[in-house]
Design a protein with these regions (language model features):
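Small/polar, glycine/serine/threonine/aspartate-rich low-complexity segments that form flexible
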Residues: 38-41, 45-54, 103-131, 254-272, ...
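Short segments within alpha-helical structural elements
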Residues: 192, 196-200, 225-253, 303, ...
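Periplasmic alpha-helical coiled-coil/stalk elements that build and connect Gram-negative outer-membrane
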Residues: 142, 158-275, 386, 410, ...
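Membrane-embedded beta-strand positions in outer-membrane beta-barrel channels/transporters
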Residues: 63, 126-128, 175, 220, ...
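Sec/SRP-type N-terminal targeting helices
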Residues: 74-75, 91, 136-164, 214, ...
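Short, acidic/charged, Gly/Pro-enriched secondary-structure junctions
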Residues: 74-92, 101-105, 294
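Terminal intrinsically disordered/low-complexity segments used for targeting and assembly
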Residues: 2-68, 150, 234-281, 287, ...
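Transmembrane beta-barrel architecture of outer-membrane proteins
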Residues: 59-61, 124-126, 173, 218, ...
Length: 469
């Protein structure tokens, strides 16, 4: 085999050897387990996707609509397409290109520049294949840049998964807030009707001399209080509806949303968080931060390779002739092969500065990665604390609401039987309304906290991340 061919094969075999440091994942700066009793309850988050987590079919449908139509999410998903295209562009540099080329040239040479002393007109025509400049990646510069582009693409993809999970959580929480506002509004309407009935009864008793003006004013005050609370709850319901409509992103979003509160006590289910090590492997923002760290690690390889020679090849093969008609005549074959070697000798410290910059950027990415883990750990711990305490609070408030409801029934019977005063009955009405409202609020907050936990754990997203066109 010819020596030039052997040298070329050796160069190609060495191409792509990376000078990037061996990547090692930093140790997670968090504890190895969760310090919460709630960590042992519910289905494991690693086995739970959002369709299973959401029990209510209406809410599942709304989340699906939002995933298909939300504008902010669509923009995020299109960022994936940009990152994927950028990676493909960078990856193409690792493969020699080939293009067809044809050119013609016709020029006049003045007599004072001609060997014959007379002006002359010359022509040349060429057609063939051309090899654009191709770098032999002996020291892994192009490979490192390609690896960095790949990690940036994977980071963008993970960030998009995080955006999808965030949207699922936002829609779920907006829906839970809306459902809670509906339930409070329904309770207020029932309470107002009951208090208006009581006011009518007292008005009759007052006309008969069996009730005082004070009794009437007390009852009237409760009616006006209920009317004010009715407007407040109606406003909260409408605001929650507006937030949900915005998240859904469709013109007919309001028509898709149920107009009556759900009769199920729980619209979502309990989940168990698993271990912090599982969180690192599952949560998208942690994965995105690690991909950025890997990209910065690859950048060091590219910066190191800049200190070494760079060899590039260009060439062409085809036919040439002074006449266009002679391009394909025998003997018109032509070729060129132009290897180029570039070796940095003096660059005023540019390459050293680039290497220092790459190392500092990697250190910064390590700090960002560790900070992301700590933030995720804190969010999970906060969500576990909230779900644990709210679960017990919800049970206590349900028991309290049941008790005050029975008290109201007894107080009403005793008042109508003339055994107790009207004031005792009004106090029972007021106490029952306050405790029923508190139970609804706590129940809503508990489910919202479960959604926070679901998001903090990475959401159990199992679908492919693709842009909706």
């Amino acid at each position: 085999m010819h020596k030039p061919a052997c040298a070329l094969l050796l160069a190609l075999s060495l191409a792509g050897c990376s000078m990037a440091p061996t990547y090692e994942r930093p140790e997670a700066p968090v504890a190895s387990s969760w310090n919460s009793p709630a960590a042992k309850t519910g289905q494991a988050a690693s086995n739970l996707d959002w369709q299973t987590f959401i029990v209510d079919s209406e809410l599942r449908n709304l989340v699906g609509v939002a995933l298909d139509n939300n504008r902010s999410l669509r923009q995020t998903l299109l960022d994936i397409e940009q990152a994927r295209a950028q990676y493909r562009i960078q990856r193409a540099d690792r493969v020699p290109g080939l293009s067809a080329a044809a050119n013609g040239n016709r020029q006049r040479l003045p007599g004072d520049l001609s060997n014959t002393g007379s002006s002359a007109v010359s022509s040349s025509y060429q057609v063939g294949l051309a090899l654009p400049e191709y770098e032999l990646d002996l020291f892994g510069r192009v490979k490192s840049l390609t690896d960095a582009a790949l990690e940036q693409y994977l980071s963008t993809e993970a960030a998009a998964r995080s955006a999808q999970i965030a949207l699922i959580a936002e829609v779920s929480q907006a829906y839970l807030t809306y459902d809670g506002a509906q339930r409070r509004l329904q309770l207020t309407e029932q309470t107002l009707a009951s208090r208006e009935d009581s006011l009518g009864l007292i008005s009759q008793r007052r006309s008969a001399g069996a009730a005082t003006a004070l009794d009437y004013q007390e009852a009237l005050g409760l009616v006006e209080q209920s009317r004010a609370e009715l407007e407040s709850n109606a406003r909260q319901k409408q605001q929650a509806l507006n937030a949900l409509v915005l998240l859904l992103g469709t013109a007919d979003a309001a028509k898709r949303i149920p107009q009556l509160p759900q009769d199920k006590p729980m619209l979502i289910q309990d989940i168990a968080p698993g271990t912090p090590s599982e969180l690192i492997e599952r949560r998208p923002d942690i994965l995105a931060a690690e991909h950025v760290l890997k990209a910065r690690n690859a950048d060091i390889g590219a910066a190191r390779a800049a200190f070494f020679p760079r060899i590039s090849l260009t060439g062409s093969f085809g036919t040439s002739s002074a006449e266009m008609s002679g391009l394909f005549d025998g003997g018109s074959r032509s070729w060129s092969f132009v290897p180029t070697l570039s070796l940095p000798i003096f660059d005023a410290g540019r390459n050293s500065a680039n290497l220092d910059l790459a190392k500092v950027r990697k250190d910064s990415a390590v700090a960002a990665y560790e900070g992301t883990i700590q933030t995720a750990f804190r969010e999970v711990a906060d969500a576990l604390a909230a779900t644990d305490t709210l679960r017990r609070e919800e049970a206590a408030r349900r028991a309290l609401a049941n008790t005050t409801n029975e008290t109201l029934k007894l107080a009403k019977a005793r008042y109508e039987g003339g055994v107790d005063s009207h004031l005792r009955y009004l106090d029972a009405q007021r106490s029952n309304f306050v405790n029923e409202s508190a139970y609804i609020e706590t129940s809503t907050q508990r489910q919202i906290a479960l959604v926070d936990l679901f998001r903090a754990l990475g959401g159990g997203w199992s679908g492919e991340v693709t842009a909706q066109r």
